[in-house]
Amino acid sequence: MLSQAIADYTLHRSTSDPLPSGPAPFTSSEFFKLCRPGTKPKAKNWDHHLSTECRNRLPSNLKASASSVKPGLDGAPIIPQRQISLGAGRPIPEYFPWDSLELSGKQSRGSPVDEAVVMPCTRGEDDFDFAVALNYGYAAGSPQLLRFITEHIEMIHNPPYDDWETCLTSGTTSAMDTVFRMFCDRGDWIITEEYSYPGAIEAVTPLGINILGIKMDGQGLIPEDLEAKLRSWDSAQGRKPSVMYIVPCGQNPTGATQSAERRRKIYQVAEEHDIYIIEDDPYYFLKLHSRLESGEVSPMPVDEYLRQLPPSYLSMDVSGRVVRLDATSKILAPGLRCAWMTCCSQIAEKYMNYTEVGSVAPSGFSQVAMYKLLDVTWGHDGFIRWLAFLSHQYRQRRDALVSACEKYLPPDLFTWVVPEAGMFLWLHLQSPTPRISCSSYSECSIEKEKTALLDLEERIYNRSMEKGVVISKGSWFAAEPDQLKGIKLRLTFATAPLDSFDWAVKQFADAVRSEL
């Protein structure tokens, strides 16, 4: 399966026009797709979902005029025979203090004994001119890296409509903040899981955007609760929510992964109520599967690994109502601050209107590093092998943390669901204790109950810190803090040394017991 797809893209590259060159050249996913234009339906128009700010934001004339390659009427790049720029305030490369960059990295399967691979990039080279990489870039990214990412998206997700685009971002957090502003005005509502990524919550709060939390179970957001809350929406609360932010795989903080059937039901509700979906999926490739069997020491074959990945919302999106955010922070390195998003061309163009006067483009250093690693050194096969290797490594770490929890956290103290993806274990503290300061727990008012729960959570957090173990409070992730019920805590198996889990969980267990 993978080998045939790679062969198809190799042939497609060999018969395609050369990549656009020069400073900040216009480029587009349309140049690199295997599927011919016009073979799938077009996306819907989303003007009615855009914020006032987004509708008023226009492309940057200065950025458009500065591009060395521009689109023609048919969308194809116009490449002039000769061009002298007396317009752009772009420094001449002779004044850049760097001439070359040399990176050393791992083979794709990630073995620590692998011989290092050297990846140079030099000024004036045909492959990716380092001088061009260091200059102002095009908002969608460099043609070299965008080609690889477009192929990757088509290979893995194959969006079922025609006019989809991928563009690079300066990290998913930055892209997420921009997308919220594109779709929401002050006073609007967005939908999230009842426990959600704090970065999203903290991004929308100062924008005056309200959050509607939807109940969750072991598979994440519950579509029946979503449908019920939308169907019974009271217009006195404001405009009915039209945007939903979700993390469908290894959800942060709960670790829940939505099944294929769950996703189809949620997408159907979105279609019926005209909801635009922000699919934030940094843990998609960290598929953990069941717990490792004794003697299972190697990652699974790449085709089997790919078959077991769940269908993304992008892969089932027939109307262009999904913007998918992919991250490098969990699969390459957080400091790259270079990721990608995929959506219909209308939304991609609106997004680039923002970046042209904001981040402009992802770092040229990061784009070079990613291109030289992903395309030149690994290729698509090597990239997938790396992802399968990472999944296997995190699977071992997940198993080690769960084993330590089974050893020190009895079910009368905590319960949890073993995560199928991601980096997190979500602990549910069983019934709070008599130390809650009410005449009787059942008689506490809602406000007293909330105060008591937060107080106990704070004491557990501080006691754990005193014992040398950092945990995350569940209240940090509550989409609607006023609806807080019970005490939940998040542990991660991503950071600490593997051999420290046993000690850390024991200390944490002692900290909890000392406060009960």
Q: For the regions a protein language model found, what residue spans apply to each?
A:
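Conserved glycine-rich beta-strand-loop-beta hairpin in the small C-terminal domain of fold type I
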Residues: 387-402, 413-432, 438-447
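N-terminal small-domain helix-loop-helix segment of the aminotransferase-like
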Residues: 37-170, 515
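Conserved PLP cofactor-binding pocket of PLP-dependent enzymes
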Residues: 83, 450, 459-490
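Eukaryotic N-terminal low-complexity, Ser/Thr- and Lys/Arg-rich leader segments
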Residues: 1-75, 79, 228-240, 294-305, ...
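PLP-dependent enzyme catalytic core of the Aspartate aminotransferase-like
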Residues: 466, 479-516
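Conserved core of the PLP fold type I
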Residues: 14-15, 20, 26-29, 109-274, ...
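Conserved core segment of the aminotransferase class I/II
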Residues: 5-33, 311-395
